[in-house]
Amino acid sequence: GHLSKELITKFNLDADSDPQAYGIGIKELWQVAPGKCKPGLVQHSLGWPLDTSTYGGSFIYHMDKDRVAVGFVCALDYADPEFSPFEAFQQFKHHPSVKPLFEGGEILSGGARTIIEGGAQSLPRVEMPGALLIGDAAGLLNLPKIKGTHQAIRSGTLAANHIAEKSNGEGFDSALRASPIYKELHKVRNIRPGFNKGLWRGLITAGIETVTAGKLPRTLHNHDDFSSLTKIKDLKTIERNWVETDLAPRDRLASVYFAGTDHDEDQPVHLQILEPEVCMTRCTEEYNNPCTRFCPANVYEVVEDEVADAGKRLQINAANCVHCKTCDIKDPYQIINWVTPEGG
């Protein structure tokens, strides 16, 4: 979260931990044609349409009243600057075994957000003067189980009891690390970073770590997601063989409507570019402006501008923002700062 980022930086809470790792999750709720939904059915996938060097997968949850939730999660340490997580999600929906479920249906809502994936080795110090980090703010998601709500509840309860007993937050970091909350994360600490070397090695690592319950005397490490992009000049051509899409939403701009976010067009821009001169110079030359692709809401757009030095400029369509914060994390120069929009 925005406040967590500020607090971690101000109090140097991550001095002794690995960089946090993130994924972008995109989700849609559909009303499907009668008879297609099987309430209670849960389907998960791994890999495609991602290449084997990129970690991620998809899910389909069959609910009541002919409703289906479908989603896609992709780790933000992917290397291809031309990659678009939104387009990858749409490709998943068009897989021959998936598309029939949605044909004849309609999308009801959608959205996107970043998911903390770092686990135990990326856990920052969770206490500071006047505040404690709990739940997702601390990064307590158990990624292999895709579960975090129980961790949020347990850490909140632990924090409340600690404050009630001590009247302050001193010692909470040690208390959390000695609790079942941390032990659960430590047990699976090597599964996510095991995929840094690719899908197949990741699956082998996950199997070993699961069988040994994380008891091997080693800890794999995470790296900054923004450091993983390959420069355009070094990029090898990737044949994705993606198909034309015809299911809703037809493009990123159309998807914004279903997210339900609401901004006044003239409100202050909450996406701050700290060094604007980098965008149409170094970023264009080195990465071809990846923000125009990693954003799932078409917030960043390169437009013609005769007045601009390069004849083009980066336009920020802040009203499109769905508050996923991918830009703040994935920008290779770390010059995009997401702040809370006017009105929240």
Predicted regions and their residues:
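Predominantly flavin-linked oxidoreductase catalytic cores and closely associated redox partners
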Residues: 1-104, 139, 155-158
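A short alpha/beta connector and helix-capping loop motif
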Residues: 11-12, 121, 145-159
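Alpha-helix N-cap/helix-initiation motif
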Residues: 15, 144-152, 284, 310, ...
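Structured mid-domain segments that build the active-site/substrate or prosthetic-cofactor binding neighborhood
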Residues: 97, 101, 127-135, 142, ...
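FAD-binding beta-loop-beta segment adjacent to the flavin cofactor pocket
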Residues: 112-143, 254-270, 278-294, 301
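Active-site-proximal substrate-binding core of FAD-dependent oxidoreductases
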Residues: 139-145, 157, 161-201, 309-317
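C-terminal auxiliary extensions adjacent to catalytic cores
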Residues: 195-247
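Iron-sulfur cluster-binding cysteine motifs and their immediate structural context
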Residues: 285-322, 326-344
